[in-house]
Amino acid sequence: MTDEPTAHSSTPLSSTPGHLAPDDVGLVTPLDFVLPRPFTFKHGQPLDGLTLRYETYGTLNATRDHAVLICHALSGNHHAAGWHSPTDKKPGWWNNLIGPGKAVDTRRFFVICANVPGGCSGSTGPSSTNPATGEPYGLRFPALTILDMVRAQKLLLDHLGVAELHTVVGGSMGGMTALLFAIEFPNFTRRLLAMATTAREGAQAIAFNEVGRQAIMQDPGWNNGDYPPNGGPRVGLAIARMMAHITYLSDASMDRKFGRRTIQSREKSPQLSAELALSDPQLSTLNAQPAAAAADFNLQFEVESYLRHQGQTFINRFDANSYLYITRALDQFDLDHAYGSLEQAFAPVLAESLIVGFTSDWLFPPEQNRQIAQALLRAGKRTSYAELSTDLGHDSFLLESEELYALIRGFLERTPPATTADFAI
């Protein structure tokens, strides 16, 4: 399924259900772009029929130069804003940022967000059916890199008729994608906005990813990557998500939200009981305890229930093999090594850049974001850096923040572009 370059995937606001705000993009329909030719991944493996699922918000203008590409993080997808149906419980993952009158104003910009190749939300990935076998690709899916994500999304933009990107925007893995987009397609990219990200995956982040991968791969349900749809290493994937989710928070935010509050019993907390009703039999091991155990290893603390709930909900929307592929792509991201130095990596960049770090982010700490901005400045690029004070951790870029919204709006709408002399780090 494809669309015309000027397609508007939102319904008119007058036809949206009553619970939607006037600044929502409304009801949106995901679209599919099937690449007309085989896509060759960085490591040389070709794939026929690579599909990218995406959404657009707003309308492409006549000059086709006001597009904003939104790049999602590890567990994100193409559904960045709006609602798929009137009964949806939640809007897109960045709905607070994208819409008419919002920081990324869909009255001014044509906004695109695509699920990356290797994902599991409609784009071709390990869980997709291999037409040659009629079975999921599993580990026969080509090795994946951030560069593959960038090149595939550029083909989508070409298909949509985008002549020039006004801005490429992303946080976390999306920030890596945005950086590489500005490097690989300098004449196409006017502005770069990367948040809560890094120029190279460090040892600690790789270590967290490896623990998650081992949780998946040691689950008997993984079966070397061959498992049926809605099956597989569900316990392992839940544990991987529980562990990773901790890295997205901060000590202060967790202490404020949970502290050492305990759970006396499920009966005393109906809401909690509903959250922990693990209907999947495979997940019963998360709550299991031998009857004769001298110590109590059942749920005691609210933070435990929160993490188990995170694991439970994640396995219902994400594929374990996609988790393996995408985290490995993150591990291999290293601009310094790939280009010889960060200055050499950023040498082709023509875009004006805004890099944003968050003080409590311990997954990609502010100093890693600052290093990106400093390298861009050393390479002679128009660059600004902002460090926002927050105790919400790595996920700060996804959460409500008027300070962040004002920063993004100002960067997107500023004219003319700044010069390197306008900013100090």
What is each residue range found by the language model?
Residues 1-8, 12-70, 84:
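Catalytic-loop region of hydrolases
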Residues 134-140, 147-167:
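Conserved acidic catalytic loop of the alpha/beta-hydrolase fold
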Residues 164-204:
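Conserved hydrolase catalytic core segment
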Residues 194-311:
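Alpha/beta-hydrolase-fold enzymes
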Residues 338-343, 365-376:
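Short alpha-helix in the alpha/beta-hydrolase fold that links the catalytic acid
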